[in-house]
């Protein structure tokens, strides 16, 4: 189908509202994307007419809710081209997915003297769990350094990998710089050294198709709320053989086969042994609607539109005096910047007065801020519902702030 941004915008109720007396220009989708009516309605319909606890229930509502939940698992597996739906675990989001891997696979496979490799551009969610794991077991955390243009110093990889490397944990797309990392070569190199690879896909899956089989990564994780779905739900993909070997992380209902006070507990098979307790079934239903929504639009169509919009934005921002942009020319989704010597919070507050929503702060990437020697950045993110006119408003707003503040 032909991509129409006007038709897309009509599906998002919040985009019709005003902020400070001006039409909302929502440029903060990298933090959390807005939700189309199709997602809102699907979740509301489930709670109105179809809600029940899933699994084990013999009554109709429970059986139907279970079927709907498992159908979303199947849809998500097709979305990332997994071999099987049973390679996907429902998690609260990217952060929980990474922590699950660190506490299940990591505790079982990383030992004192081993090392894990991350990069200098990672979100805290792909730093802190590995720091905690390394501290627990006495392993080393190694870091791929950055180039000033926001790309990684890939030439250092050969010196970082050795026979003690157990994992490469790498972002697919930087949440600050928009850098898309060249995963294919990195994954091949990691596997040549016997290491597993976890990919943080939180900032990638909404921008273009992702094929986990083609990537050949061992773990891939993403959140629903950045993909126009609900909060509190995400997907962890793990290669099936690897997933079946992993011990459970959390204990409780739904993840057991048998429980005995005298003989202990046995686990059900994966992925269900990683889904203890009552799941966020409504969120799962909403995620399914979000996956269907972007799939119908076509991720290739979305990618083409967003690429054109990004090129336009970068071109227009060249007209803003004293504007510092961070990241490479070829980027996905986000534009991080500072205006002169003004603090990002001040710039963001002025933009909010103009009805423009951007993110300000360290963006859960403090090591990246330290590399650029700044306390914070502004970040405008471009999604499939953003327009050239909204880019123009951002540029005009920054020009106005420059005139006001100098």
From Swiss-Prot:
It comes from the Bacteria. Cysteine desulfurases mobilize the sulfur from L-cysteine to yield L-alanine, an essential step in sulfur metabolism for biosynthesis of a variety of sulfur-containing biomolecules. Component of the suf operon, which is activated and required under specific conditions such as oxidative stress and iron limitation. Acts as a potent selenocysteine lyase in vitro, that mobilizes selenium from L-selenocysteine. Selenocysteine lyase activity is however unsure in vivo. Pathway: Cofactor biosynthesis; iron-sulfur cluster biosynthesis. Its cofactor is pyridoxal 5'-phosphate. The modification N6-(pyridoxal phosphate)lysine is found at residue 226. GO terms for molecular function: cysteine desulfurase activity; pyridoxal phosphate binding; selenocysteine lyase activity. Its EC number is 2.8.1.7, 4.4.1.16. The keyword NAD does not apply. It catalyses: (sulfur carrier)-H + L-cysteine = (sulfur carrier)-SH + L-alanine; L-selenocysteine + AH2 = hydrogenselenide + L-alanine + A + H(+). SUPFAM superfamilies: PLP-dependent transferases. It is found in: Cytoplasm. It comes from Shigella boydii serotype 18 (strain CDC 3083-94 / BS512). The gene is sufS. The active site is at 364 (cysteine persulfide intermediate). One of its GO terms (biological process) is cysteine metabolic process. This is Cysteine desulfurase. Keywords: Cytoplasm, Lyase, Pyridoxal phosphate, Transferase. GO terms for cellular component: cytoplasm. Belongs to the class-V pyridoxal-phosphate-dependent aminotransferase family. Csd subfamily. InterPro entries: Aminotrans_V_dom, Aminotrans_V_PyrdxlP_BS, Cys_dSase_SufS, PyrdxlP-dep_Trfase, PyrdxlP-dep_Trfase_major, PyrdxlP-dep_Trfase_small. Homodimer. Interacts with SufE and the SufBCD complex composed of SufB, SufC and SufD. The interaction with SufE is required to mediate the direct transfer of the sulfur atom from the S-sulfanylcysteine.
């Amino acid at each position: 189908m032909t991509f129409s941004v006007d038709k897309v915008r009509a599906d998002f109720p919040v985009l019709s509202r005003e902020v400070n007396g001006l039409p909302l220009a929502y440029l903060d989708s990298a933090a959390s994307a807005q939700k189309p009516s199709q997602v809102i309605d699907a979740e509301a319909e489930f709670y109105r007419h179809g809600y029940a606890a899933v699994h084990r229930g013999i009554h109709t509502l429970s059986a139907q809710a279970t079927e709907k939940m498992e159908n979303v698992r199947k849809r998500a597996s097709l979305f990332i081209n997994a071999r099987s739906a049973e390679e996907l675990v429902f998690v609260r989001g990217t952060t929980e997915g990474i922590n699950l891997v660190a506490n299940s696979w990591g505790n079982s496979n990383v030992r004192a003297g081993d090392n894990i490799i991350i990069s200098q551009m990672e979100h805290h969610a792909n730093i802190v769990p590995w720091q905690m794991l390394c501290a627990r077991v006495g392993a080393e955390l190694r870091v791929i350094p950055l180039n000033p243009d926001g790309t990684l110093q890939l030439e250092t990889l050969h010196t970082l990998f050795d026979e003690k490397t157990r994992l490469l944990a790498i972002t697919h797309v930087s949440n600050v710089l928009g850098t898309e990392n060249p995963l294919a070569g990195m994954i091949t190199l990691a596997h040549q050294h016997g290491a597993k690879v976890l990919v943080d896909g939180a900032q990638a899956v909404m921008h273009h198709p992702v094929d986990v089989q083609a990537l050949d990564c061992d773990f891939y994780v993403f959140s629903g709320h950045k993909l126009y779905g609900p909060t509190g739900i995400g997907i962890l993909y793990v290669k099936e053989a690897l997933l079946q070997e992993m011990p459970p992380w959390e204990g409780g209902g739904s993840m057991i086969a048998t429980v005995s006070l005298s003989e202990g507990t046995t686990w059900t098979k994966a992925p269900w042994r990683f889904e203890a307790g009552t799941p966020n079934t409504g969120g799962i239903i909403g995620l399914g609607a979000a996956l269907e929504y972007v799939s119908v639009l076509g991720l290739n169509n979305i990618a083409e539109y967003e690429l054109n919009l990004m090129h336009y934005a970068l071109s227009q921002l060249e007209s803003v005096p004293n504007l510092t942009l961070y990241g490479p020319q070829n980027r996905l989704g986000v534009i991080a910047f500072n205006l002169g010597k003004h603090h990002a919070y001040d710039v963001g507050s002025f933009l909010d007065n103009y009805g423009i929503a951007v993110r300000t702060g360290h963006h859960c990437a403090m090591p990246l801020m330290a590399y650029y020697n700044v306390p914070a950045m502004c970040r405008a993110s471009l999604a499939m519902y953003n327009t050239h006119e909204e880019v123009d408003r951002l540029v005009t707003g920054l020009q106005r702030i420059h005139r006001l503040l100098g």
